[in-house]
Amino acid sequence: MTLAAPIAVYVLAALAEIAGCFAFWAWLRLGKSPLWLVPGMVSLAVFAWLLTRVDADFAGRAYAAYGGIYVTASLGWLWLTEGQVPTRWDILGGGLCVLGAMVILAGPRAA
C-alpha cells in the first residue's frame, strides 16, 4: 500500500479546511468583509468532499489520520501565511501528530 495518495489528499484537504476557517477568522477577528465567507464556505465544502476521496473503510479512521496532517499544515499556515515562526514545541508537537497519522495509515488491518 502506498501512502502517497492518501497523504496528498489529506494535504489538499488541510489546505482547504484551513483556508475556509481562516475566512471566518478574517471576518470575525480581523474585521474583514462578510464576503470572505463565500469562498470560505466553498473551501470548507471542498475539504469535506476531499476527505471522502480517501480509501478508508471507516470515516473515523480517515479523520484520525487526517488530524496529524492538519496539525502540521496549520503550523505551515502559521509560518507562511501569518508570518509567525513555529516554536520548537510547535514543531515537536506537529512531528508527533504526523507520526501518529502514519501509524494509523500504515497499521495492519484484520481481513
Curated annotation (Swiss-Prot):
| Record keywords, A-Z | Cell inner membrane, Cell membrane, Membrane, Transmembrane, Transmembrane helix
Gene Ontology annotations for the cellular component aspect, listed alphabetically: plasma membrane
Q: Any idea what this protein is called?
A: UPF0060 membrane protein Pden_1837
Where does this protein reside within or beyond the cell? Cell inner membrane
Membrane topology field: Multi-pass membrane protein
Cysteine pairs forming cystine bridges in this chain are: none
Instruction: Give the UniProt family note.
Output: Belongs to the UPF0060 family.
Which residues span the membrane?
Answer: 7-27, 30-50, 62-82, 91-111
Organism the protein comes from: Paracoccus denitrificans (strain Pd 1222)
InterPro entries from the UniProt entry: UPF0060 (IPR003844)
SUPFAM superfamilies, alphabetized = Multidrug resistance efflux transporter EmrE
The source's domain of life comes to Bacteria
